[in-house]
């Protein structure tokens, strides 16, 4: 009997133990990452040929203590390598692990190689050659603290390489993991199996090979025992012949069918090729179609199983599409696959929540470095009085109600950008803005007391409901997370897409960027204030301070201003403002753009203006500004500087976003200024619920 070890992906150890026992292994012991077992030579070949779950089959050769590189050398050389190697066999060493002595795996591999080669030369035998690419023997050494474990890898290449997959095509899951997913799915061979996001077909091919009793090792051309002196070719050929006989019989007797689809025609062609190479191509029908086109291939029965490894995203901007995909799959399953089972393997349990289905079972496993979960569902048979579940129903109803009211109002006003929802319901704490046929969801960061998992799942529900209510494709929904802004955070870049969208606001055309910054380039709550500025601008010299992207300057210019002066500290936003002005035919000397610290420029300027708009930050201590600024503390001093630039009879429109702002009317009176609050006049219906979003004043000389 031989002591052996079968490695596997984390989470599959018990499944592998059961498989090995069915093959005849004894004394099976599960450890993290694999199973120790005992077996004769025939079992070695049986496990290599038939294990669908093992990554490698390892034959331990010995252990040694390593306190120095000499200890490693002598420990390896103590093994009788001349009785392990066939004459002329090539080899490679795979070394993993470090300690205080062996600090580099390449150095460790070199010492092992030297010890093996010297074992031959000391006996005056021809030294074996190293072949790193395709060796006859692969020696594995694991160093754990002071103990080195030396073993012969009888697999050669990893056992997940069945020989049917085009190596040029990347697979998101290895074949061994795919086999485990199929085994855990609850699918019964002989019943239909469908993968609506099949990619290169790995799940379906592994299922078909299992169902037709086709050994996973049948198509492999190279093994790790070809240079092993104890290899028994007779037994190996018997094992191989038995596998071939069983495969022919299994294929001839199998009567059910497999169905795969994917939106990418190239991967479907690859899947067909893989299935043909695996010898089960005739059992699988592959089609090019996306999930939206998914339908039950057997509406009259029998019931089957839908299985898939759907895509998941690591980037925030990919989530809307993925949530929509999972939500859509859930609806299709409930509408068309009543009585079927569903099994999905994913690195994102939150995305699986978007299915709006309750799992009967779940399993955990590792896919490389990723922690993954497999969830199994049974789809109840639908009845005539069955009502489809609504995702985030309260939120969806409120959004639908707001849309009905605001869409008509926006059309009448001639605006394309407006707020549809602003945390109307406390449990759905987001803002939803419409930009033409796009939507932006801004998630207000939940407090630390809220469970992060629940908050994320609720956000996914919000996205799914928003897409459903607005009827927009996922690629036209942008997701952002908004926290309380400090200083210049709101101006920091979030992305590098550089995609601009042209929108209309009354008679103005403006550029917005929905992805690259937290804000889009257009403050929607100031819409009416901008229109008022346009109405007040005829024949006047207009100054726009803290101008952002210059949308107020556009309205003033279109309103007939004699000149516009646009001042901001950011070159990026001034260039944006220039684009906005140019889009509306406003260019030339009459429309100046000045990059400067607005407060510093204000103190130095000696020009005169009839109409001034200023919307300063609530607080700023930018390194590029000469001093910190607090709008509550400093607004009177600000008005003093502004008055110096104001022509007789001129007007200042002053706005800020500080909640609870108190205008110092006495301080203004001492400057000879009067202030009229116009906040309510500047709030449009889409911001009617949030009356503190800004405050706005008209200030004139007394």
Curated annotation (Swiss-Prot):
It catalyses: guanosine(2445) in 23S rRNA + S-adenosyl-L-methionine = N(2)-methylguanosine(2445) in 23S rRNA + S-adenosyl-L-homocysteine + H(+); guanosine(2069) in 23S rRNA + S-adenosyl-L-methionine = N(2)-methylguanosine(2069) in 23S rRNA + S-adenosyl-L-homocysteine + H(+). SMART domains: THUMP (SM00981). Its main location: cytoplasm. GO terms for cellular component: cytoplasm. Residues 43-154 form the THUMP domain. The keyword Methyltransferase applies. InterPro entries: 23SrRNA_methyltr_KL, DNA_methylase_N6_adenine_CS, RlmKL-like_Mtase, RlmKL-like_Mtase_CS, RlmL_1st, SAM-dep_methyl-trfase, SAM-dependent_MTases_sf, THUMP_dom. The keyword Cytoplasm applies. GO terms for molecular function: 23S rRNA (guanine(2445)-N(2))-methyltransferase activity; RNA binding; rRNA (guanine-N7-)-methyltransferase activity. Its EC number is 2.1.1.173, 2.1.1.264. Pfam families: Methyltrans_SAM (PF10672), RlmL_1st (PF22020), THUMP (PF02926), UPF0020 (PF01170). Keywords: Cytoplasm, Methyltransferase, RNA-binding, rRNA processing, S-adenosyl-L-methionine, Transferase. It is an enzyme of class 2 (transferase). Transmembrane segments: none annotated. It is found in: Cytoplasm. Disulfide bonds: none annotated. It comes from the Bacteria. Belongs to the methyltransferase superfamily. RlmKL family. HAMAP family: 23SrRNA_methyltr_KL. Specifically methylates the guanine in position 2445 (m2G2445) and the guanine in position 2069 (m7G2069) of 23S rRNA. This is Ribosomal RNA large subunit methyltransferase K/L. It comes from Salmonella arizonae (strain ATCC BAA-731 / CDC346-86 / RSK2980).
């Amino acid at each position: 009997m031989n002591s052996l070890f079968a490695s596997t992906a984390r989470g599959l150890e018990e499944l592998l133990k059961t498989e090995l026992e069915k093959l005849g292994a004894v004394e099976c012991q599960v450890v993290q990452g694999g199973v120790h077992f005992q077996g004769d030579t025939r079992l070695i070949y049986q496990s290599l040929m038939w294990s669908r779950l093992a990554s490698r089959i390892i034959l331990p050769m010995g252990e040694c203590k390593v306190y120095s590189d000499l200890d490693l050398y002598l420990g390896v050389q103590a093994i009788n390598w001349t009785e392990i190697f066939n004459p002329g066999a090539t080899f490679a060493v795979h070394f993993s692990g470090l300690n205080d002595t062996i600090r580099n795996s390449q150095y460790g591999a070199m010492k092992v190689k030297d010890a093996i080669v010297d074992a031959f030369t000391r006996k005056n035998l021809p030294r074996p050659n190293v072949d790193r690419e395709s060796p006859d023997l692969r020696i594995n050494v694991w160093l754990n603290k002071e103990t080195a474990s030396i073993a012969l890898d009888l697999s050669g290449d990893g056992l997940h390489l069945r020989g049917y997959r085009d190596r040029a095509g990347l697979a998101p899951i290895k074949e061994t993991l795919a086999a485990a997913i199929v085994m855990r799915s609850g699918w019964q061979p002989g019943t239909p199996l469908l993968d609506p996001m099949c990619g290169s077909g790995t799940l379906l091919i592994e299922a078909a090979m299992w169902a037709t009793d086709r050994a996973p090792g049948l198509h492999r051309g190279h093994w790790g025992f070809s240079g092993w002196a104890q290899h028994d070719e007779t037994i190996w050929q018997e094992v191989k012949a038995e596998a071939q006989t069983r495969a022919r019989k299994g294929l001839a007797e199998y009567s059910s069918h497999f169905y795969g689809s994917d939106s990418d025609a190239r991967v479907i062609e690859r899947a067909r090729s893989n299935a043909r190479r695996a010898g089960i191509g005739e059992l699988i029908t592959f089609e090019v179609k996306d999930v939206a086109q998914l339908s039950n291939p057997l509406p009259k029965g029998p019931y089957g199983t839908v299985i898939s490894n759907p895509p998941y995203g690591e980037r925030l901007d990919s989530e809307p599409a993925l949530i929509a995909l999972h939500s859509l799959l859930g609806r299709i399953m409930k509408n068309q696959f009543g009585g079927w089972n569903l099994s999905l393997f994913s690195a994102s349990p939150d995305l699986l929540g978007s299915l709006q289905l309750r799992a009967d079972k779940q399993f955990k496993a590792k896919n490389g470095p990723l922690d993954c979960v497999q969830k199994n569902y049974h789809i109840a048979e639908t009845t005539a009085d069955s009502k489809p579940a609504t995702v985030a129903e309260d939120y969806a109803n409120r959004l639908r109600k707001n849309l009905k009211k605001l869409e008509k109002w926006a059309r009448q006003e001639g605006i394309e950008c407006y707020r549809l929802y602003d945390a109307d319901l406390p449990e759905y704490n987001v803002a939803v803005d419409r930009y033409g046929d796009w939507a932006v969801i801004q998630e207000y960061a939940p407090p630390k007391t809220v469970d992060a998992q629940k908050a994320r799942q609720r956000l996914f529900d919000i996205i799914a409901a928003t897409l459903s209510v607005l009827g927009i494709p996922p690629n036209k929904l942008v997701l952002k997370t908004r926290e309380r802004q400090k200083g210049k955070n709101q101006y920091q870049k979030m992305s590098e897409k550089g995609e601009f969208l042209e929108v209309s606001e009354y008679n103005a055309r403006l550029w917005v960027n929905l992805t690259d910054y937290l804000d889009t380039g257009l403050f929607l709550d100031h819409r009416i204030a901008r229109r008022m500025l346009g109405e007040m601008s005829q024949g006047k010299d207009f100054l726009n301070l803290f101008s952002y992207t210059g949308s107020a300057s556009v309205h003033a210019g279109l309103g007939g201003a004699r000149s516009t002066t646009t001042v901001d500290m950011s070159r990026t936003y001034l260039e944006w403002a220039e684009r906005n002005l140019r889009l509306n035919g406003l260019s030339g000397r009459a429309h100046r753009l000045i990059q400067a610290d607005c407060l510093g420029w204000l103190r130095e300027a000696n020009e005169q203006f009839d109409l001034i708009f200023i919307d300063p930050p609530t607080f700023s201590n930018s390194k590029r500004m000469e001093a910190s600024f607090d709008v509550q503390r400093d607004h009177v001093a600000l008005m003093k500087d502004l008055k110096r630039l104001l022509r007789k009879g001129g007007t200042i429109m002053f706005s800020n976003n500080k909640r609870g702002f108190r205008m110092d009317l006495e301080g203004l009176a001492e400057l000879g200024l009067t202030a009229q609050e116009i906040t309510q006049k500047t709030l449009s219906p889409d911001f009617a619920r949030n009356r503190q979003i800004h405050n706005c004043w008209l200030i004139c000389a007394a």
